[in-house]
C-alpha cells in the first residue's frame, strides 16, 4: 500500500500546467494495441469516454469505440473510431475524429518476458477546417489534425513492467485549416492556416500492481513524447513559416485503475497530468488534465 500511495503522489502531486494530451495525435493511446485480453477469447469490444481541459478554458468530451480480433496467440488486429466535442468561447463543435487500424504481433514468451511489435494507420474524418457560423476555428476546436499517419511501435513486457516505444509519422497531409489569429480578435491560439505537423516519438514505462484477489490492477505510467521538429503554417502573405518552440519534449504522468468483474468484463479509470511541456502547442493537443473511463467486454 505504501508503494501505491508513493506512486500516486508522484503522478498527481504537480502544479497545474499545460502539455500535449492523449487526444487526436493518437500516439499516447496506441499502447492498447500491445495489450490483449484473456487468450481464450478471440474478440474484444471497448467503449470509452474521455473528459479533458484545454487551453483558453476549452473543454473536451471524446468518446470512442474499438474492436480487437485475436487470430491466434501471435496476431491481433484493432480498429477504433473517435468522436470529439469541443466547447469554449468560440462555441461548441461536435464531429467524428479519426479511424485507427492497428496490427500487433507478439513474439514467443521467454522467462517471464515477451516482445511485441505494432504497425498501424490513422485516417481522418475531416480536413481539420470545421467552422462555427462560418468562422474558421483553431486546431484546438478541430476533431482531427487532418493527416493520414503511420504508427510503428514495439513493446517489451517483463513480469510487471512494460516498456514501449513508438513513432507517429504523418504520411499524407489533408489539413485545410484556415485559422489566422490576426483575424480572430484573440491571441489565445496561434495561426494554423494549412498546418503541417512533424512526427512524434514516444517512450513509455508502466508498472502493474495487482491486489491479492487480482480483481483490481493499478498501473502508473510515465510518458516521454518528443515532437521531431517545428510545425509550419502558411501566413497571410502565402509564405510557409515555422512555428518557433513547437518542437521538443513533453512528459506526462498517467494513472490507470482497472476493476475486473470477471474474465470477460472489466472497467478502467484513468487520469493524466503533465510534468514537462513544449513552449507552444499549435496542434490543439494542449491539456491540463485528462480523465477517462473505459468498459471492456471479451468474448
Describe each model-derived feature in a short phrase.
Residues 49-55, 69, 81-87, 107, ...:
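Transmembrane beta-strands of outer-membrane beta-barrel pores
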Residues 58-63, 89-94, 128-136, 168, ...:
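Outer-membrane beta-barrel translocator domains and adjoining extracellular loop/strand segments
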Residues 59-63, 94-99, 113, 144-150, ...:
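Residues that define the transmembrane beta-barrel architecture of outer-membrane proteins
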Residues 66-68, 104-106, 153-157, 164-166, ...:
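Transmembrane beta-barrel domains of outer membrane proteins
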Residues 93-195:
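Outer-membrane pore/translocation modules
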